[in-house]
From Swiss-Prot:
Species whose genome carries this gene: Paracoccus denitrificans
Main enzyme class: lyase
Domain of life: Bacteria
Cofactor(s) required for function per UniProt: pyridoxal 5'-phosphate; Mn(2+); Mg(2+); Co(2+)
One BP annotation, GO: D-serine catabolic process
Known function: Catalyzes the condensation of glyoxylate and glycine into (2R,3S)-beta-hydroxyaspartate ((3S)-3-hydroxy-D-aspartate). Functions in glyoxylate assimilation via the beta-hydroxyaspartate cycle (BHAC). In vitro catalyzes the cleavage of both D-erythro- and D-threo-3-hydroxyaspartate to glycine and glyoxylate. Also acts on D-threonine, D-3-phenylserine and D-3-3,4-methylenedioxyphenylserine.
Entry similarity comment: Belongs to the DSD1 family.
UniProt pH dependence: Optimum pH is 9.0.
Name of this protein: 3-hydroxy-D-aspartate aldolase
Catalytic activity: (3S)-3-hydroxy-D-aspartate = glyoxylate + glycine; (3R)-3-hydroxy-D-aspartate = glyoxylate + glycine
Miscellaneous information on this protein: Strictly D-specific as to the alpha-position, but does not distinguish between threo and erythro forms at the beta-position.
Gene name of this polypeptide: dhaa
Amino acid sequence: MNAKTDFSGYEVGYDIPALPGMDESEIQTPCLILDLDALERNIRKMGDYAKAHGMRHRSHGKMHKSVDVQKLQESLGGSVGVCCQKVSEAEAFARGGIKDVLVTNEVREPAKIDRLARLPKTGATVTVCVDDVQNIADLSAAAQKHGTELGIFVEIDCGAGRCGVTTKEAVVEIAKAAAAAPNLTFKGIQAYQGRDAAHGQLRGPQGQAGRRHCPGERGRGRAGGRGLAPEFVSGGGTGSYYFESNSGIYNELQCGSYAFMDADYGRIHDAEGKRIDQGEWENALFILTSVMSHAKPHLAVVDAGLKAQSVDSGLPFVYGRDDVKYIKCSDEHGVVEDKDGVLKVNDKLRLVPGHCDPTCNVHDWYVGVRNGKVETVWPVSARGKGY
């Protein structure tokens, strides 16, 4: 699904949380809202940064799962394409008109490989990560079957302990196999540090996270020395892009959360000790929630609980206020400490979620707000696309 302009037949509250032209106070809750001004500033800022540092930026769609947000990242921020984690995510973006798709994950099940090999028929350029020679053979066979071409990134484990090879020899072996396989092209190296790479680190030249880049450097050097110079060394998330872009190794970034921000990223500080969500980036994503009960004088209950957010990275914080605090939640309820009794039933609060990616995945819509008015409503196009 792409951005809608015709909402005839949609019932507010049942089908959709709001319609363009409504006041923010009229939005049905709990739902996701986007501060469009902040979102656009974040997108432009990352695009300007990448350009100034001679880097390509491929925005990570697993964060927002939205064709419309991705198109905004391409038009305003110069994103060259989208990263996805699942074949079904890639299908949603390709079918939605995104022309360059990188699956930053391994695809091994035969049925999924077959779906991936068909995807270039949508007109999209499709690339996938590999960490095993047998996977090369399987991808090549499927691409030949469908008469398509697939790009290959060899994935290096940069310390996350997940997918990816750990030796230079393995990089060369897989790159050689990809270069020789029919209907496949060896394009480069995937070396992504992950969300936690810079947590607890200073974001400046004195930070230590940059030391993790040596696997990407070794992999590029060894492959290039065998006549298999990678076109791209890709990686670098919101928590570590500073290091990749100044490493002299990478030429493509894969940032995602920068566009929305969340409470967990707010724990990262820049070289001056400031939170990166209060200066470097802006909070653009919020869970809008309403007070539904204030039976206890010091506690307000809101309608955003576990089913409206992910708390794997901590509880949300109440945006723009230090007089109230979100302190706990259950399935359908959130409890807000209100020591001074300032909240009233039906008051609305903006919550900054602890972790944006899985929070977005439990909602159907983004409500885009500017100056207190609903300007647009976008579907979460790849919501639930985990297969």
